[in-house]
């Protein structure tokens, strides 16, 4: 099925690994031209290189999304390379470290707020301004099942709260910008695991503590299939781990005109661990 994304100017934040890698490759495969906005320029270039034989063009613009000036510069470079932004995927986000709430420092909490809330704000405000002016565009915010399923927010309550903000923000903005032709939707990942250990950068959740605690991607896949997993798949009707392309598929749908009558919506890509 042709999603009509060929030549669409697309910005994907946090596109250097994990879910971001899947998003970049998915959009490039559909012919979209992609800017990878990431702090890890080296890892971002590895993803761009992996996409070199796909129909869409991919470039890397090293960006700290918590810095408004850096975001404005990135959006300007994207426009120079591929034209005005058609699609924005706010994927950059993360947990500083799983910690019981009363033990979490204010500094660590602020890190999560800056990345997960202000990063989305800066990118949406900057790229969205042009969308509103042109009367078209699609914004997809990658949230988390930690904002939907209490078990998934265990020791990451602050992170789940920031993602809950993004959900509410998305609905409000969808209502405000709908008359201007701009749609805003959310994709909420469940347990999504990279295909390979080296598909993520040094600053990722997986590198910092995920692999040490949960095992390698292959080990997690085996544990989920056998029912022996020590992570949040025990209540999933679909007994497998999610992969980055699962998030990409849902995001591509929201980016395309196949979803042209959908805005303010959220889909949980979690094997059924959350149902609405």
PLM feature segments, named:
Residues 2, 95-98, 240, 250-252, ...:
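Short C-terminal tail/terminal secondary-structure segment
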Residues 16-17, 40:
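Conserved glycine-rich cofactor-binding loop
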Residues 41, 62-74, 106, 245-246:
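The beta1-alpha1 cofactor-binding region of Rossmann-like NAD(H)/NADP(H)-dependent oxidoreductases
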Residues 49, 179, 191-235:
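A glycine/serine/threonine-rich, flexible loop-to-helix segment
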Residues 99-101, 107-113, 139, 232:
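Substrate-binding pocket helix/loop in short-chain dehydrogenase/reductase
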Residues 140-165, 170-179, 191-193:
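Catalytic loop of short-chain dehydrogenase/reductase
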Residues 178, 183, 262-264:
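Short, small/polar-rich loop/turn modules that mediate ligand/substrate recognition or access, typified
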């Amino acid at each position: 099925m042709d999603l009509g994304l060929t030549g669409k100017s697309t910005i994907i934040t946090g596109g250097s690994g994990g879910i971001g890698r899947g998003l970049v490759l998915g959009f490039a495969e559909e012919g979209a031209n992609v800017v990878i906005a990431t702090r890890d320029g080296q890892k971002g270039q590895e993803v761009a290189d992996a996409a070199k034989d796909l129909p869409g063009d991919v470039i890397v613009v090293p960006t700290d999304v918590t810095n408004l000036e850096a975001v404005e510069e990135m959006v300007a470079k994207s426009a120079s390379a591929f034209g005005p932004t058609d699609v924005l995927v706010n994927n950059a986000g993360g947990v500083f470290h799983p910690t019981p709430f009363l033990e979490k420092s204010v500094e660590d909490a602020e890190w999560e707020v800056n990345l997960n809330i202000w990063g989305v704000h800066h990118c949406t405000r900057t790229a969205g301004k042009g969308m509103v002016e042109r009367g078209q565009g699609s914004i997809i915010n990658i949230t988390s099942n930690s904002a939907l399923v209490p078990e998934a927010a265990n020791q990451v309550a602050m992170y789940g709260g920031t993602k809950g903000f993004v959900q509410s923000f998305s609905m409000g903005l969808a209502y405000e910008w709908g008359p201007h032709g701009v749609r805003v939707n959310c994709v909420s990942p469940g347990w999504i695991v990279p295909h390979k250990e080296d598909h993520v950068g040094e600053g990722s959740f997986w590198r910092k503590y995920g692999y040490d605690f949960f095992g390698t991607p292959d080990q997690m896949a085996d544990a989920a299939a056998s029912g022996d997993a020590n992570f949040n798949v025990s209540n999933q009707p679909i007994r497998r781990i999610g992969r980055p392309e699962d998030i990409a598929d849902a995001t591509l749908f929201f980016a395309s005109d196949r979803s042209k009558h959908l805005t303010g919506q959220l889909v949980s890509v979690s094997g059924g661990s959350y149902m609405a």
